[in-house]
């Protein structure tokens, strides 16, 4: 059951299924009306540096859509790529992809890397190999050099901004609740 829809149904003295049908009719209309205010990759400033990270927005558990299952998070959801400025302001959110899509593939499919110079932007280890500024992985059975450790520390001191932006996004119930 959808508690929000049940509450709306009680307030308007109609059934929950009626509310569900009304929501289903108006959702695409609202999305179309708001589309002009949704920034796309092409709207990003080509001269600005961005911090990129991916997040999983949980969704209902569809047994007939196994591609929504994220092995990393052990739940179903959609993969969103998020970009923020160095001042910590949300700049862009990608269209959703299935939860089983790796961040590197998701950022490639979003068009971000084609629209902007990848070498300017900061990401986590999930984006290694895409030309972005990323931390260095520790070699198997080895240690990082001191310069790599300092480099990783510098990158991670900046990356906290995108983590805060994503945490702020997820305060919206629809982006953190499995419904």
Question: Where are each of the predicted segments found?
Answer:
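Short, well-ordered secondary-structure "scaffold" segments embedded in the functional core
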Residues: 2-179
């Amino acid at each position: 059951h959808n508690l929000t829809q049940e509450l709306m149904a009680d307030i308007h003295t109609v059934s929950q299924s009626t509310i569900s049908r009304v929501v289903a009719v108006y959702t695409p209309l609202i999305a179309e009306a708001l589309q002009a205010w949704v920034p796309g990759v092409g709207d990003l400033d080509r001269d600005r540096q961005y911090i990129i990270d991916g997040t999983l927005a949980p969704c209902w558990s569809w047994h007939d859509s196994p591609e929504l299952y994220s092995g990393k998070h052990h739940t179903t959801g959609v993969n969103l790529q998020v970009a923020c400025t160095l001042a910590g302001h949300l700049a862009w959110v990608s269209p959703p992809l299935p939860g089983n899509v790796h961040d590197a593939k998701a950022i490639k499919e979003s068009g971000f890397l084609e629209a902007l110079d990848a070498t300017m932007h900061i990401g986590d280890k999930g984006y290694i190999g895409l030309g972005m500024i990323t931390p260095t992985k520790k070699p198997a059975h080895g240690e990082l050099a001191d310069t790599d450790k300092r480099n990783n520390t510098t990158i991670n001191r900046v990356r906290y901004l995108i983590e805060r932006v994503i945490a702020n996004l997820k305060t919206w119930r629809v982006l953190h609740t499995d419904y």
